Amino acid sequence: MGPWGEPELLVWRPEAVASEPSVPVGLEVKLGALVLLLLLTLICSLVPVCVLRRSGANHEASASGQKALSLVSCFAGGVFLATCLLDLLPDYLAAIDEALEALHVTLQFPLQEFILAMGFFLVLVMEQITLAYKEQTSPPHPEETRALLGTVNGGPQHWHDGPGIPQAGGTPAAPSALRACVLVFSLALHSVFEGLAVGLQRDRARAMELCLALLLHKGILAVSLSLRLLQSHLRVQVVAGCGILFSCMTPLGIGLGAALAESAGPLHQLAQSVLEGMAAGTFLYITFLEILPQELATSEQRILKVILLLAGFALLTGLLFVQI
C-alpha cells in the first residue's frame, strides 16, 4: 500500500531476473575438476606400480630396488604425517565445530576427541580380532604374537608375490594387509569429503581454487599411497585396484556435493563430520603405529631416512601453506 492508501504498482525489473542464473555457479569448474582429478590421481597411483614392476623383473636390481623403495617410502611417510596432523585433523575439527555451532549445541564433553579415539580403537580392535582368529586357526609364530607397537625386524627382505613388493622375513601378512586396507579406507573416505567440499561450493573462484589445490595434493598422496601399499605384502593387482578405488573417491565426492548443494544442512554437516573424525582417528593409528615405526625400524641409512621424512613433511606443509 502507498502512503495514502492506494495500492502500489508492481514494477518488473529485467536485471533482477537476469541476476538469477539457471545453472549453478562453478558447475563447469566442478565437472572439469572431476575429470582432471580422476585422470591425474589414477596416473599417479599406477606409475609407482608400473615402475617397480618393471625394475623388479631384473633380479640383479632387487637389492637396489629394495633400498630405493625404502627411502622413497620414508618420503611418503613424511607426506602421510603432514596429511594427518595438518590436513585431516584441522579439517575435521573445524567442520564439527561449525556443525555444532549451526545447531546451537554447546557441550562440556570433549566430543571431537572422543570421535577420534573411537576411530583409533576401531583399527586396534579389528587387528586384535584378526590376530586372535589367526592364532586359533594355525600354530602361532613368535613374531605373530608381538605387540602392535612392535616394528618389523631389521633382517633382510626378499621379493614376494610379484616383482617390486618386499616382504620382511617373519612379518605376518594379515595385520599388515589389514592395516593397508584400513589406510586405503580412511584416505578414500577423507577424499570423498574433500570432493564434497568442492561440490558444495557455490562460488566459482573458490571452487577453482580448491580444485587446483586438490590436484596437487591428491597427486602427491596417490604416489605415496601406492608406495605404502607396495610394502604391505599385497599383490600388484591389489595395489592397482586400491589405486583405482582411491582415484574415484574425490570425483565421487564432487558429484555428490554438486547434487546435494541445495539441500545440505547442519545435520548433514554433523553426520559428515562424525564420519570424517572416525576416518581421521583410523589414519592417526596407521600413521603412528604402522608407517613411521616400520620405516624407521632398520639401522640402515638412518640419517638419510630422517631427511627424506622431513622432506616429505615439508613438501605437503608448503602445499597447504600455499592453499591458505
UniProtKB/Swiss-Prot annotation:
GO terms for molecular function: signaling receptor binding; zinc ion transmembrane transporter activity. Keywords: Cell membrane, Endoplasmic reticulum, Ion transport, Membrane, Transmembrane, Transmembrane helix, Transport, Zinc, Zinc transport. InterPro entries: ZIP (IPR003689). This is Zinc transporter ZIP1. It comes from Mus musculus (Mouse). It is found in: Cell membrane; Endoplasmic reticulum membrane. GO terms for cellular component: endoplasmic reticulum membrane; plasma membrane. Residues 1-30, 90-104, 201-206, 259-272 are extracellular. GO terms for biological process: embryonic cranial skeleton morphogenesis; in utero embryonic development; limb development; zinc ion transport. It catalyses: Zn(2+)(in) = Zn(2+)(out). Belongs to the ZIP transporter (TC 2.A.5) family. Transporter for the divalent cation Zn(2+). Mediates the influx of Zn(2+) into cells from extracellular space. Residues 52-68, 126-179, 228-237, 294-303 are cytoplasmic. Pfam families: Zip. It is a multi-pass membrane protein. Ubiquitous, except in the pancreas. Highest levels seen in kidney, salivary gland and placenta. The chain crosses the membrane at residues 31-51, 69-89, 105-125, 180-200, 207-227, 238-258, 273-293, 304-324. Its main location: membrane. The keyword Ion transport applies.
